C-alpha cells in the first residue's frame, strides 16, 4: 500500500506499478489518501510513504505511520529525501531511501538506501542489485558525496537556520496554512495564498503540482548559519 501525499507519492505509485509488471510476487498495490489511513486495519506486506512531501508542504507524523505499520503487521518504507536530518525517528521504518539534496542540503545526484535486514529477493537488473553497489561494481556519484563533506561538519548550524525561518514564518503566516502543527515539516510550509518576491537573491520553490497556494522552502538563510534571524522573510509578498 502506498499513501497518497502528492507528486512524490505519485512517483512511488508509478514505480511500484512498473515493478509489478516484472515481479510476479507483487500481487496488488493500493493507493490510499493520507487522510484515510486511520481507516486501514487489514494485513499488508508493505506500507510506502513520503515522510515529508514537499510538493504539498506537509509531513505525515511518524508516530501515526508506526501505528499503521503495527496495526497492519506490515513493513514500512519511507521516502526520506526531505526529512532526513531534519525530522526524527527514521529508525521506525524498515527501509528508508533518500537523496543528497533537500534534507541533507547537498547537491543532487546521489541516492542512499538504509535498511534493517538484507533483502532476500533476486534482482536481475545490474544497477538495482544492491550487492553490485556494495561491491563498487559501478562508478558512484563521488562529486556529489564529496559536497556533503563540509556540509555534514556544519550540519547543525544549517539546520538551525531552517528552524529559525520555519518558526518565524509560522508565527507570521501560520494562519494561512491548512495543516495542523503535527503535519508541519521543518523544511517547508504550504499556505493557501500565492507568494511573490522582487528580491533577486530569493529563489522561490516551485512545487511539481499546480496548487491554489504556495509552498515556501526554508533554505534561504543556510549560508548565515548561527547568524540567521529569518530576515529574508521580510522580502516576501503574500498576495
What are these regions (language model features)?
Residues 101-171:
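Active-site C-terminal subdomain of aminotransferase-like
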Residues 152-184, 192-199:
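Conserved PLP-dependent catalytic core of the aminotransferase class-I/II
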Residues 11-21:
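Active-site-proximal loop->helix
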Residues 31-80, 84:
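Active-site phosphate-binding strand-loop segment of PLP-dependent enzymes
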Residues 177-239:
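Conserved C-terminal alpha-helix-loop-beta "cap" of PLP-dependent enzymes
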Amino acid at each position: 500500500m502506498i499513501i497518497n501525499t502528492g507528486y512524490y507519492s505519485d512517483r512511488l505509485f508509478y514505480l511500484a506499478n512498473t515493478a509489478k509488471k516484472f515481479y510476479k510476487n507483487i500481487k496488488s498495490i493500493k493507493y490510499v489518501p493520507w487522510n484515510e489511513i486511520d481507516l486501514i486495519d487489514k494485513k499488508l506486506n508493505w506500507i510506502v510513504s513520503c515522510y515529508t512531501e514537499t510538493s504539498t508542504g506537509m509531513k505525515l507524523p511518524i508516530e501515526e505511520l508506526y501505528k499503521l505499520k503495527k496495526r497492519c503487521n506490515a513493513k514500512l518504507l519511507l521516502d526520506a529525501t526531505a526529512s532526513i536530518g531534519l525530522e526524527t525517528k527514521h529508525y521506525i521504518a524498515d527501509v528508508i531511501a533518500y537523496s543528497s539534496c533537500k534534507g541533507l542540503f547537498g547537491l543532487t545526484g546521489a541516492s542512499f538506501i538504509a535498511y534493517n535486514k538484507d533483502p532476500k529477493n533476486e534482482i536481475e537488473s545490474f544497477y538495482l542489485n544492491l550487492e553490485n553497489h556494495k561491491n563498487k561494481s559501478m562508478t558512484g556519484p563521488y562529486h556529489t558525496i564529496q559536497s556533503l563533506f563540509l556540509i555534514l561538519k556544519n550540519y547543525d548550524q544549517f539546520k538551525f537556520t531552517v528552524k529559525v525561518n520555519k518558526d518565524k514564518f509560522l508565527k507570521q503566516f501560520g494562519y494561512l496554512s491548512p495543516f495542523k502543527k503535527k503535519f508541519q515539516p521543518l523544511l517547508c510550509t504550504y499556505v493557501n495564498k500565492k507568494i511573490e518576491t522582487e528580491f533577486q537573491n530569493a529563489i522561490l520553490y516551485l512545487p511539481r503540482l499546480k496548487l491554489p497556494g504556495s509552498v515556501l522552502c526554508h533554505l534561504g538563510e543556510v549560508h548565515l548559519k548561527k547568524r540567521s534571524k529569518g530576515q529574508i522573510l521580510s522580502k516576501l509578498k503574500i498576495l
